[in-house]
Every structure is written in C-alpha cells, then in structure tokens.
C-alpha cells in the first residue's frame, strides 16, 4: 500500500531539487548546526534515540538539522522507528501503517509489513491502521531529512492519539521488545514533537524550559504533569515520554542540541512555536 505525501508543497518543497536546497539551507542556517555532515559507515551507534520537531521546514528545519547531523554521522540505520502525535484524530489510539511505500519528492521509504506485524505482536497497544496516517504530518516531515542522506530506508511509522504516561509505557516496552528481538540490527528511534504553541517568544521559551528540565531529568511522569499543570502545549508529549522510558532501558542520557522558536527563524516573535533537538547517548 502506497502512502502519498500529504504536506509536500506546504510544510516542505514539492520539487526534489528545491527540497534538497531547503534541507541544505537548514543545515547552514545560523540556528542550524552550521554545515552538512559526512555520512558515517555503519557500525556501533552511540546515539540511538532523538527528539526532532515537525513544523514547516522554514520554521523548524534548522533545529531538526541538529538531530540529523548526529544521526547521519553514524551511518544508515537498518530500521528507523518514528513516533509522532496524531493531530487529525483519525484512526486508533496508537496506529502503525500496514506496510508498503511512503513517498516523498526524494523517493520512497519502505514499511516492511512483516516487521509491522512483529511490532504489533510484542506491543499491547499498537494497531495496524492506515487512517491515522493519511493526512498526518508529524512523521512525513522527517522522511526528506532521512532521504537526503540515505537511500532505501526501512521505517516503522507509529502515531499516538492517546497521550498518557501509561500509553507511553506500553509503546516504549513494545519497542524495547522489538529491539531485543533484532539485536543484530541498527535501529534508531525518532520522537517527533514540537513544544509550546502560539504564545509570545519569551513565554514559550519559559514554558519550554519546564519541559526541557524534565527531559534532562529523564522524568516522563513529571513531564506529563508539567504539560497538564502549566498548559504547555507540546503536541507530541507521548512520543517524548516513550523516548525517555526507552532511553532508560538502554542506559542512555539526553543531550540537548538546540532549543529555539519559530520566531528565531521567521523574525516574528509575537506568536511562536517552540522546537527542540535532542540526542540520547552514553
């Protein structure tokens, strides 16, 4: 089953040459990492988990580039598991694409139906459901960054509608079991999320810092409490919580790579969205 791009031409360029230029712009942007990394050879991976934003590239691309800089340096993963929030409300509580190609202007990424069934079998909450993915952007916008560096990607896209600590625990445990079954594979997990939405820049930076402190403390329940109590409008807090739980199981620590807002890239700081790039390593 083919999944065609839903946000090409809006969140990112729908022309392949222009899209490549946009990605290069993100890496060279003053908010970005400052250059394009050399793709490393496959081998030992010290950064298996990342947090990445998912807005329009002109806004969040330079922040996202920080995570992809480290990912690319360690070579092409065998499998990329991408966790994103469900913005549309379609589909089940936790949904994975059934299998087939995901298309973007830079080519196709493969969703292996057998691996999908295996992840579902070791998880208690993940359902096979294409409806949740048809118009969702949180996973799609990660693919061109990956495809810029790697051909013939194998991905497992999972979107989460029910964003509670309990669901995050189930998702993380299922992924952990899957990783243990495939200990010979190089598997990377991406948690796709933006941070606070539509407050002024200074307010957003303050609210975001509450969340970032909980990420640094590896406190996923505390993160959930902050989001709820302080009205921090993080759209993908379940993917972030799952990444923290999984990182603990893998004995990895968070390293904040970049925190900025859409105001830093657009110049308009009256109403912004916060973005965070984080890697998890030894």
From Swiss-Prot:
Gene3D superfamilies in alphabetical order: LigB-like
Matches recorded under Pfam families: Memo
InterPro entries for this protein: MEMO1_fam (IPR002737)
Family of this protein: Belongs to the MEMO1 family.
Protein name listed in UniProt: MEMO1 family protein Msed_2139
């Amino acid at each position: 089953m083919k999944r065609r791009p839903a946000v090409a031409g809006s969140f990112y360029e729908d022309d392949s040459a222009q899209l490549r230029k946009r990605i290069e712009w993100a890496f060279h942007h003053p908010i970005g990492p400052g250059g394009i990394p050399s793709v490393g050879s496959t081998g030992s991976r010290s950064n298996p988990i990342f947090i990445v934003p998912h807005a329009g590239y002109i806004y969040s691309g330079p922040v996202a580039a920080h995570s992809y800089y480290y990912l690319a340096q360690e070579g092409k993963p065998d499998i990329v598991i991408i966790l994103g929030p469900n913005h549309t409300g379609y589909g089940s509580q936790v949904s994975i694409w059934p299998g087939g190609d995901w298309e973007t202007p830079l080519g196709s990424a493969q969703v292996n139906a057998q691996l999908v069934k295996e992840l579902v079998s070791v998880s208690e909450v993940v359902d096979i459901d294409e409806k949740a993915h048809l118009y969702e952007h949180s996973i799609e916008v990660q693919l061109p960054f990956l495809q810029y560096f790697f051909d013939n990607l194998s991905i497992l896209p999972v979107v989460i509608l029910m964003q509670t600590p309990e669901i995050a625990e189930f998702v993380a445990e299922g992924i952990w079991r899957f990783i243990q079954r495939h200990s010979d594979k190089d598997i990377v997990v991406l948690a796709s999320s933006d941070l606070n939405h539509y407050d002024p820049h200074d307010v957003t930076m303050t609210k975001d810092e509450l969340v970032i402190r909980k990420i640094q403390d590896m406190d996923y329940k505390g993160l959930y409490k902050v989001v709820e109590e302080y009205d921090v409008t993080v759209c993908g807090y379940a993917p972030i919580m799952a990444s923290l739980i999984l990182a603990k199981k893998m004995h990895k620590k968070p390293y904040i790579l970049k925190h900025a807002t859409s105001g830093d890239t657009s110049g308009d700081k009256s109403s912004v969205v916060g973005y965070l790039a984080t890697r998890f390593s030894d």
